Amino acid sequence: MAANMYRVGDYVYFENSSSNPYLIRRIEELNKTANGNVEAKVVCFYRRRDISSSLIALADKHATLSVCYRAGPGADTGEEGEVEEEVENPEMVDLPEKLKHQLRHRELFLSRQLESLPATHIRGKCSVTLLNETESLKSYLEREDFFFYSLVYDPQQKTLLADKGEIRVGNRYQADITDLLKEGEEDGRDQSKLETKVWEAHNPLVDKQIDQFLVVARSVGTFARALDCSSSVRQPSLHMSAAAASRDITLFHAMDTLHKNIYDISKAISALVPQGGPVLCRDEMEEWSASEANLFEEALEKYGKDFTDIQQDFLPWKSLTSIIEYYYMWKTTDRYVQQKRLKAAEAESKLKQVYIPNYNKPNPNQISASSVKATVVNGTGTPGQSPGAGRACESCYTTQSYQWYSWGPPNMQCRLCASCWTYWKKYGGLKMPTRLDGERPGPNRNNMSPHGIPARSSGSPKFAMKTRQAFYLHTTKLTRIARRLCREILRPWHAARHPYMPINSAAIKAECTARLPEASQSPLVLKQVVRKPLEAVLRYLETHPRPPKPDPVKSSSSVLSSLTPAKSAPVINNGSPTILGKRSYEQHNGVDGNMKKRLLMPSRGLANHGQTRHMGPSRNLLLNGKSYPTKVRLIRGGSLPPVKRRRMNWIDAPDDVFYMATEETRKIRKLLSSSETKRAARRPYKPIALRQSQALPLRPPPPAPVNDEPIVIED
């Protein structure tokens, strides 16, 4: 019962989206709407993921400690011997990367922004406290639903401010304490230079005479306000003018005038009414206009007694001293008393607490057990994997959970286990750090398919795999120049083989800037790409039509082979079939030609390197771990078997390719030079043309029989 009772001042979780993390808010008010619903007026807290990366870097810089140390014992205590150094919190250094990652999820940023949310969206309580340097950082991780903050975030201005003042430590900020005087020792300092006397307690006047003089001073102040046009507008009545003349500013000036005239009342009255007219003394209450007073009340309602923020955002033309002085005078007015009574009456009529039952509705991101089917690859399930097991958890990489939740973009089909989903909703991140944040253990290899692709739990094999979003890298001229000038730093071949390794672009840019003056003496020749206009290309295609490709001339050997029975030489494709309709590698990589004919070509297994492989029936190969069936109908060169057409889906991804090298291909590989091998690897779509000198040697003829005598067979 108490856990579901929410009061003003509680820190709570709010859910605004079924897939996003909870919002963290502090309840300021509970209001009942006209239709009977309860709305909560809350203060917003922001996570690290909600603000920009530049402000995150600023917050991390603020978290460093400024350690002041001296050059050594006995050194000068002045500013020369004091050195400031920014170091990382030593406690953060000792924490492992996983705890550092989780500690960042506990950091929040306070804001002055208020918003109203339905109370039915509350999903639980949490605790938020100001960061305490005396507490251990691990203590925040040991407590459940516990957060801390140290900076204030302004979502409109996109700025960060410190929420508390800082105590300045050092000789420049601390007072020098003199030694204690001994018994009977006199102070050698001149006291007249250290203090100023403004009132003499033992003066010749009695209290009655002083009170009468103060009454005269009030009367002079009232008369001066009657003569002043601006004051007559602000205090239109005599009663208000007399009240303004009776404030402390008038009395302090009268007593100061009496002290300066050596407590001679007649001289003091003459000083109050000089030749030009009576003296008018105004305080902050009279100096401020009505519009400025309204701005101050609005700022006080939003920021409270944070006078620095009030000055910066509402009254920048006023000094901080003036604002503080006006505040304490404003508290003595009738308007302040009336507002205080009105707020107290409103607080009595408002709700103090509200009961919100537990939210038991199913989350739309839940993955139902009926939709999880056993993953089938090439007609067989993954060995050692239980039916229903799919992709592992993106956070902890577990494959066992009583409930799964879809997470991330829908096309990625990522999911989280129940424990990591609760952590994601509360803390706005994953338990384990990613490779961008630090070390992260690799995925569970038991959850991989035979081709190394994670098996997805989807009802239809058409959506078993999704392609990643493509990108286009547009390089500038300076980037292309830097590739040549800083080749030993950039190491382009190494970077191409390891695209996931980061490149220090700042160091390369600095080195390129330093080498540019020397390189200007021998300028680099960049290849200029001249693109012809579209009209010129169309005219060329009209004048040079492509001739039709002639049919290949069949040789006598091919004619004889077409008449061979089907069982004589079955053609085996050594590439493993894919789960996407058993399509070959060439179909996925866009080789020119008719797709239907290409699927039926007997040399499709090695078409990329221009070699046709024919295997006799004597060699029994394995296909997907099973022996190839002997009763296989051979596909003749010009025949087209009834193949079920399947349209290629643009979101389907090709399967991995397994290339099995034979003795013949190894011999061909030895005939190629290293440059030709590398060129073929960089351009796998181009066929390899072997020169006649590189042709394979013919097999020697069979040896002649040893016995030359004829063999006679008698009946």
Curated annotation (Swiss-Prot):
Q: Which residues carry this modification: Phosphoserine?
A: 386, 449, 522, 576, 639
**Where Phosphothreonine occurs, residue numbers?**
564, 578
| Zinc fingers (GATA-type), renumbered ranges | 393-420
A GO MF annotation of the entry reads: transcription coactivator activity
The record's account of tissue expression is: Widely expressed but not in skeletal muscle. Highly expressed in the brain, liver, kidney and cardiac muscle and in mammary tumors.
Task: Name where it's found.
Answer: Nucleus; Nucleus envelope; Cytoplasm; Cytoplasm, Cytoskeleton
Please report, in chain numbering, the residue ranges of the motif SH3-binding. Answer: 545-552, 696-705
Where's the BAH domain? 1-164
Motif position, SUMO interaction motif 1 (SIM): 711-715
Quick one: where's region Interaction with RBBP4?
656-686
May I ask which residue range the UniProt record assigns to the signal sequence? none
After translation, how is this protein modified?
Phosphorylation by CSNK1G2/CK1 triggered by estrogen enhances corepression of estrogen receptor (ER). Acetylation is essential for its transcriptional coactivator activity.
What does the UniProt record report as the effect of altering residue 322 to A in this chain? Reduction in the ability of MTA1S to repress ER transactivation
Listed InterPro entries = BAH_dom, BAH_sf, ELM2_dom, Homeodomain-like_sf, MIER/MTA, MTA1_R1, SANT/Myb, SANT_dom
Cross-link Glycyl lysine isopeptide (Lys-Gly) (interchain with G-Cter in SUMO2 and SUMO3) mapped to chain: 509
Q: Which UniProt keywords apply?
A: Acetylation, Activator, Biological rhythms, Cytoplasm, Cytoskeleton, DNA-binding, Isopeptide bond, Metal-binding, Nucleus, Phosphoprotein, Repressor, Transcription, Transcription regulation, Ubl conjugation, Zinc, Zinc-finger
Which family, according to the similarity comment?
Belongs to the metastasis-associated protein family.
Q: How does it assemble?
A: Component of the nucleosome remodeling and deacetylase (NuRD) repressor complex, composed of core proteins MTA1, MTA2, MTA3, RBBP4, RBBP7, HDAC1, HDAC2, MBD2, MBD3, and peripherally associated proteins CDK2AP1, CDK2AP2, GATAD2A, GATAD2B, CHD3, CHD4 and CHD5. The exact stoichiometry of the NuRD complex is unknown, and some subunits such as MBD2 and MBD3, GATAD2A and GATAD2B, and CHD3, CHD4 and CHD5 define mutually exclusive NuRD complexes. Interacts with RBBP4; the interaction is direct. Interacts with BMAL1. Interacts with CLOCK. Interacts with COP1. Interacts with CSNK1G2 in the cytoplasm.
The name on file for this protein is: Metastasis-associated protein MTA1
**Which species expresses this protein natively?**
Mus musculus
List the gene name: Mta1
